[in-house]
Regions:
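Short helix-capping/hinge motifs at transmembrane helix termini and TM-loop junctions
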Residues: 17, 49-51, 58-60, 93-96, ...
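Short membrane-interface helical motifs at transmembrane helix boundaries
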Residues: 41-68
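Alpha-helical transmembrane segments and their helix-entry boundary regions
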Residues: 97-101, 127-128
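Alpha-helical transmembrane segments of multi-pass membrane proteins
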Residues: 1, 61-87, 102, 112-113
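Transmembrane alpha-helix boundary/anchor motif
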Residues: 7, 44, 48-52, 85-86, ...
Length: 154
């Protein structure tokens, strides 16, 4: 994800410098397509190989069982987080840090409330669910800010 974000960040900065909305749209479309392939690939690989990697890291059955129980959250993580991380880089490339600040403000409040509620009902599953839901919320918020990028190209 970092490589995709780094390339997108520099190309978005170039689009802003030239005030080229078409380049912005192209970078966004291509980056999201590449990201979709990455998300599917990494999630499938993690699902298929989770037992191998868990057993490679520990030979304690109780630790392996716990890791296996919570591995679904690691498989879901790229699905929840990658779009937000890509858009975070794009907003940084344009210099639109207000959107990032606003997203982080909402995400921190959401995380605090969500973990208090979900951990009391679901225990450790609650914190893992909170973690993924917070990343998903960050992605959604940054998607909602996409129309505001057009002001940089007038």
């Amino acid at each position: 994800t970092s490589g995709n974000t780094g390339i997108a960040l520099s190309l978005i900065g170039k689009a802003k410098g030239y005030k080229d909305i078409n380049l912005l749209n192209s970078v966004l479309k291509i980056s999201l397509r590449c990201l979709a392939v990455f998300i599917i690939f990494i999630s499938v690989i993690m699902y298929i190989t989770k037992s191998y990697f868990i057993n490679m890291m520990t030979d304690l059955a109780i630790v392996a069982n716990y890791a296996n129980d919570y591995s679904i959250y690691l498989i879901l993580h790229p699905i929840c987080a990658c779009v937000g991380l890509l858009l975070y880089g794009m907003y940084t490339g344009i210099g639109n840090t207000a959107s990032i600040r606003n997203m982080m403000f909402v995400a921190v409040i959401f995380f605090y409330i969500c973990q208090k509620i979900l951990m009391s009902y679901l225990g450790n599953d609650g914190i893992w669910l909170t973690y993924n839901l917070t990343y998903l919320l960050e992605s959604i918020i940054l998607i909602l800010y996409l129309p505001s990028l057009k002001k940089y190209f007038n």
